[in-house]
Curated annotation (Swiss-Prot):
Abundantly expressed in myoblasts. Enriched in brown adipose tissue (BAT) versus white adipose tissue (WAT). Expressed in hepatocytes (at protein level). Expressed in T lymphocytes. The expression in granulosa cells of antral follicles is induced by luteinizing hormone. Expressed in chondrocytes and osteoblasts (at protein level). There is a cross-link at residues 102, 133, 144, 211, 213, 283 (Glycyl lysine isopeptide (Lys-Gly) (interchain with G-Cter in SUMO2)). GO terms for cellular component: C/EBP complex; CHOP-C/EBP complex; chromatin; condensed chromosome, centromeric region; cytoplasm; nuclear matrix; nucleoplasm; nucleus. This is CCAAT/enhancer-binding protein beta. It is found in: Nucleus; Cytoplasm. Changing residue 39 to A/Q: No effect on interaction with EP300. The gene is Cebpb.
Length: 296
């Protein structure tokens, strides 16, 4: 961690035109912000500037070459290269003439690292370009014809590599994906599935049925054939006799039920006649007799 002491103006970017530096409680990093270790030699003290508006740790800088890079300048013999900027010039001005030891290779970014030859001599070199991740290609899992099988077999090693990149288990069966996220692409089918896919999608012509068993030639004049026919005839006659018996029993049952129904109907008619006779008798009796009979 840096120490909050004083910030060197050489490490600051050029301020805008309407910007005035803020000095609150004098919290600046000390001038050794470009030091390579914790015990680096501090920069030599500078003479105070003539103008009273500039602070102790600041100095007057001519911004005209940087604000107008295309304008001709009398102080510069040739225009500065494109890769040089304001901070790089300040860095070269402050530390270019002083001999320094080889900086220690720490984890944080070293502002004056001697090994970074490709980066411009600025306080903060640009970060290296990020490596591009190449995603494996995926082929559509559509069913192909049987004549495309040689082409599929030719491209099988690449499909297998892409498949192994997304399959969690290196088995022949289709395993689970490496991540459960729904944004990850589906895995390539396994070799067994790829071989079985054409057969599942295109069944092709139906397989020829197995050759029927050759019919055994039977000699109708043989005793075995005659015995079989006789047994079949006996079984047919028995079944017919049973059917006739069931029909006769059903007819007999129907006749019995019909006779019972007629008998009951006759009984109902007789009772109806008796009821009507009794009603007529009660109508012919006198009322006083009926009243006395009711009290009894």
């Amino acid at each position: 961690m840096h120490r909050l002491l004083a910030w060197d103006a050489a490490c600051l970017p050029p301020p805008p035109a309407a910007f005035r530096p803020m000095e609150v409680a004098n919290f600046y990093y000390e001038p050794d912000c470009l030091a390579y270790g914790a015990k680096a030699a501090r920069a030599a003290p500078r003479a105070p500037a003539a103008e009273p508006a500039i602070g102790e740790h600041e100095r007057a800088i001519d911004f005209s070459p940087y604000l107008e890079p295309l304008a001709p300048a009398a102080d510069f013999a040739a225009p500065a290269p494109a890769h040089h900027d304001f901070l790089s010039d300040l860095f070269a001005d402050d530390y270019g003439a002083k001999p320094s030891k080889k900086p220690a290779d720490y984890g944080y970014v070293s502002l004056g690292r001697a090994g970074a030859k490709a980066a411009p001599p600025a306080c903060f070199p640009p970060p290296p370009p990020a490596a591009l991740k190449a995603e494996p290609g995926f082929e559509p899992a559509d069913c192909k014809r049987a004549d495309d099988a040689p082409a599929m077999a030719a491209g099988f090693p690449f499909a297998l590599r892409a498949y192994l990149g997304y399959q969690a288990t290196p088995s022949g069966s289709s395993g689970s994906l490496s991540t459960s996220s729904s944004s990850s692409p589906p895995g390539t089918p396994s070799p067994a599935d790829a071989k079985a896919a054409p057969a599942a999608c295109f069944a092709g012509p139906p397989a020829a049925p197995a050759k029927a068993k050759a019919k055994k030639t039977v000699d109708k004049l043989s005793d075995e054939y005659k015995m079989r026919r006789e047994r079949n005839n006996i079984a047919v006659r028995k079944s017919r006799d049973k059917a006739k018996m069931r029909n006769l029993e059903t007819q007999h049952k129907v006749l019995e039920l019909t006779a019972e129904n007629e008998r009951l109907q006759k009984k109902v008619e007789q009772l109806s006649r008796e009821l009507s006779t009794l009603r007529n008798l009660f109508k012919q009796l006198p009322e006083p007799l009926l009243a006395s009979a009711g009290h009894c």
